Amino acid sequence: AVKSAAFANGMPDTSSWKPGVDYVRADTGDDFPDAFDAVVMIEKAVVREDGSVTFDDDVTVEPGSGVRPAGSTLRAGEPLMSAGSIIRPTDLAALAMGGATMVPVRVKPRVAFIPTGSELVPAGIKPRRGQNVDTNSLMCKHLLIEYGAEPVVFPLVHDDPVELERAFEAALATADVVVVNGGSALGEEDFNVKLIERRGQVVHHYIAAVPGRPLMLAVADGKPVVDLPGPTMAAYFGSEWCLQAITARILGIPLRRRPVVQARADAAKTSIPKMANIARVHVTRDDEGYAAHFLDFKAGELAACMTSNAQRVSPLGEAGWAEGDLLDVELLRGEEFVDQG
């Protein structure tokens, strides 16, 4: 750090300069006496053993150059963040700069997830004939975490009305939102619908979306209740449009938007115009741009659907598309994960 006045008439004679008198050493972020009002990068200077200094010929010094005065990082009264913002690591740094070590935040909604079905076994248990692995608890738990909720996953509940009611009441007592998974249709053992109809007020049952049409929305004890269909893709779609929206509403944040690209359809496909249709897609990239291979969860491609890198939700009124049509698809892993060729 130097005194800019010494450079008023160009490069001064520095052969007799002394540290602490004509200049001081200062690392990035250091404070130094106010008399030294400019900084020259050390890469542009040579400090001799006797303390004198020489500067590169191209050094120019103006008052305040290289110096950040006190208060320049943040001005008194300047807003740091807006309400409803999600606090990122960089936001924490800005808050600390302003001395805000404690800020009010919205509490993450506790979402109870009750998996139901006598045919289900926990993940990690080899299923016998007639049994299915409970994959939805794992999937929906981490979807809810992505959405900003605090999931509370209950143990598996058999298709037993008494056992189901016990779990449902426990969930209502401890959570802000209750999700019952399975039993949302009108089958012989679909007890969930009857329980929710008796215990709460049904807002809507059967929606214009496939897969997942039997989804039910209700309110019980003033809390949102969702009966999420059991099939994996149906549970996923219901989580995406319904559970995510409920969580965002409670948190007061907008719905997230994934990156969207236009991709060529590799085959013609029909959809139900009266329904929103979700399709999982594998997107690749070639010399002509993006290509979309649509997967069919009903044709033995369920695992591939779950690990695909994109998806598309067909809007209401769309009857399908032809091979080669350019379609908007959502990237689920980011553009950097799209395969080449």
Regions picked out by a protein language model, each given a short descriptive name:
Residues 66-180:
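Phosphate-binding glycine-rich loops and their immediate beta-loop-alpha structural context
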Residues 74, 197-341:
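Flexible glycine/proline-rich
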Residues 10, 15-18, 32-34, 46-48, ...:
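Solvent-exposed alpha-helices and their adjacent loops that cap or buttress functional pockets
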Residues 187-199:
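Short Gly/Thr/Asp-enriched flexible loops that form oxyanion-binding sites at enzyme active sites
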Residues 29-30, 118-119, 183-186, 231-232:
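Short glycine-rich anion-binding loops that position phosphate/pyrophosphate groups of nucleotides
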Residues 1-101:
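Phosphate-interaction motifs
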